[in-house]
């Protein structure tokens, strides 16, 4: 996408001049003030002046894009901490930039890093021998709704190259469930190289791990403290009393609460508004820095180009921001693979490779919980078979084949697939996925998509988030925590938790939080090792998957009977989840 910033800005300035002339002709006057946007509390303003790559262990040795380590550092081994058990805020920022950049972009030379893209590649696409550091100032703030549980983090980055004569702002909501630096390698890098201010935000997600055992939290700067010691800088703590927490720990020790899951905010409904708030704060920051007594608000939506752009959930946040932008802040949207929660499958069509596809128009929770039931079985089908040894063939790589076959057996016993053996049952499972919306091009992708945890993680996280359930609810007998090599919940290693702001991605991907099925036969286990009570075998916790599906559909996943007050899950739980899903659908009015 090519954006002509000059032509758009000229039109905006002309309209501003016309509006001013009309007001003057009518005898009106304007006395603009630079007001802090509602709900926003500034936390810090820090200069990151580095232009030469180094260790990046202090603010003075860091820049906005690479944390001071440059193109070479982003492509190298993880930067070390002086004290791994007690990383500093500066070290955590550096490593968060490192992990978030690499978490979205291919950092391998053969993948194009350093030649097609990367800090050393200019905005015009020229490959340089430099390290690509971008010095400037970063303004961190928190957006809250008064509850103390929303706590959306915003980081406005203003490069020293910001052009006051041609102002532009790029809004970068984090992809996935990532923290505030989640879009640094996508929208962030593009905007900084263009000399734009960049407004990064976690959009209400982020790495917020609350340790139920010791009442510790992440602070806004990524360091850890007790809830009390963190005070107003607390990023997230579960809304639970000490007495309730003690009782919970006695039954379910070594568990973690996750911000996106347990904030009881349904943050997805606010992704668009949070992205808009980041944009408004960016305008405030620019005016606060460059405004004068004679002209306190030199930058306005009328003379500043504002682009919202990101990928995945960040792309959805960008679309949501454009839908909710009644004030004309945003000029353009760049959304890569956005999670598009459609309200209907009617009135439009979708083609793939020139051919019409079926099964579209469903929500993320619908697709995810359906796939979570059938994918491990379908991965064994002949049409999905692979012989390669790679991450792509993860079920075979890590020895999950027997458990996947057990999933096929369990589905057959419950009448959810047909066939006399694994070959027939897995083919039926694959056919069901195709009929539900997955194309044959996805046949071999079910293997890694499921076995790496996408289905179990999203099916555990999103329904709980939509339903606004507290951590102690253990919906569908599911919780979250660190686990050992056999999948049993254990205490998080102190250094792991201390570094988690920089290593975790806001989900239950095992770094360090994992999806735990509490009623696995023999004791609570991570989803990979779970033994379902109804089958008595290790089948990736089929019972939990069926329960999570029922939360989304409102009916028993085996019998099709409507949920009741005594069923698992209950009707009330499903009603809450479906109400939350209704809050996140888009309307397409940009």
Where are these regions (language model features)?
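C-terminal His-loop and adjacent cap/lid subdomain of alpha/beta-hydrolase
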Residues: 32-590
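Sec-dependent signal peptide recognition
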Residues: 9-16
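N-terminal secretory signal peptides that target proteins for export/translocation
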Residues: 1-9
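Bacterial Sec-dependent N-terminal signal peptides
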Residues: 16, 20-40
């Amino acid at each position: 996408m090519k954006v002509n910033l000059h032509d758009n800005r000229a039109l905006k300035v002309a309209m501003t001049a016309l509006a001013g002339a009309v007001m003057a002709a009518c005898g009106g006057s304007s006395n603009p003030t630079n007001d802090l946007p509602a709900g926003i509390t500034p936390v810090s303003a820090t200069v990151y002046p580095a232009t030469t790559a180094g260790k990046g262990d202090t603010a003075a040795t860091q820049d906005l894009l690479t944390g001071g380590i440059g193109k070479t550092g982003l492509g190298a081994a993880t930067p070390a901490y002086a004290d791994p058990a007690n990383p500093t805020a500066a070290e955590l920022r550096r490593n968060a930039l490192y992990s978030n950049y690499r978490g979205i972009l291919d950092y391998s030379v053969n993948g194009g890093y350093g030649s097609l893209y990367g800090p050393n590649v200019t905005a015009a696409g020229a490959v340089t021998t430099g390290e690509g550091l971008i010095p400037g100032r970063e303004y961190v703030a928190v957006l809250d709704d008064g509850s103390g549980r929303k706590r959306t983090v915003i980081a406005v980055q203003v490069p020293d190259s910001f052009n006051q004569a041609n102002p532009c702002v790029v809004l970068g909501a984090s992809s996935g469930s990532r923290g505030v630096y989640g879009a640094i390698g996508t929208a962030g890098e593009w905007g900084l190289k263009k000399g734009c201010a960049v407004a990064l935000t976690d959009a209400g997600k982020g790495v917020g791990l609350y340790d139920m055992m010791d009442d510790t939290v992440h602070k806004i700067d990524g360091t850890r403290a007790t809830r009390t010691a963190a005070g107003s800088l607390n990023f997230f703590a579960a809304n639970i009393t000490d007495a309730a927490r003690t009782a919970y720990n006695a039954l379910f020790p070594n568990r973690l609460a996750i911000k996106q899951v347990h904030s009881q905010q349904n943050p997805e409904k606010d992704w668009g508004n949070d992205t808009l708030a980041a944009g408004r704060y960016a305008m405030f920051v620019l005016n606060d820095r460059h405004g004068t007594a004679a002209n306190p608000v030199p930058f306005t939506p009328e003379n500043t180009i504002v682009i919202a752009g990101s990928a995945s959930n960040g792309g959805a946040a960008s679309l949501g921001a454009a839908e909710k932008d009644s004030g004309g802040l945003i000029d353009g949207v760049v959304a890569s693979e956005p999670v598009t929660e459609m309200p209907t499958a009617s009135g439009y069509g979708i083609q793939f490779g020139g051919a019409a596809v079926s099964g579209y128009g469903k929500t993320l929770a619908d697709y995810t919980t359906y796939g979570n039931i059938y994918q491990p079985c379908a991965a064994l089908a002949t049409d999905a078979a692979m012989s390669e040894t790679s991450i792509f063939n993860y079920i075979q790589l890590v020895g999950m084949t027997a458990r996947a076959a057990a999933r096929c057996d369990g589905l057959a016993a419950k009448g959810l697939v047909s066939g006399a053996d694994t070959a027939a049952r897995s083919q039926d499972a694959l056919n069901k996925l195709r009929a539900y919306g997955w194309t044959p091009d996805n046949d071999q992708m079910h293997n890694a998509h499921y076995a790496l945890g996408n289905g179990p993680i999203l099916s555990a996280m999103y329904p709980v988030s939509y339903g606004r359930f507290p951590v102690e609810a253990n919906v569908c007998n599911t919780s979250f925590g660190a686990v050992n090599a056999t999948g049993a919940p254990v205490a998080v290693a102190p250094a792991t938790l201390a570094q988690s702001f920089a290593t975790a991605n806001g989900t239950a991907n095992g770094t360090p939080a994992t999806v735990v099925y509490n009623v696995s036969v023999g004791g609570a286990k991570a989803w990979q090792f779970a033994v379902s009570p109804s089958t008595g075998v290790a089948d990736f916790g089929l019972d939990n998957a069926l329960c999570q599906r029922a939360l989304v559909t409102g009916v028993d996943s085996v019998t099709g009977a409507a949920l009741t007050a005594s069923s698992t899950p209950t009707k009330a739980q499903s009603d809450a989840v479906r109400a939350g899903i209704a809050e996140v659908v888009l309307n397409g009015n940009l």
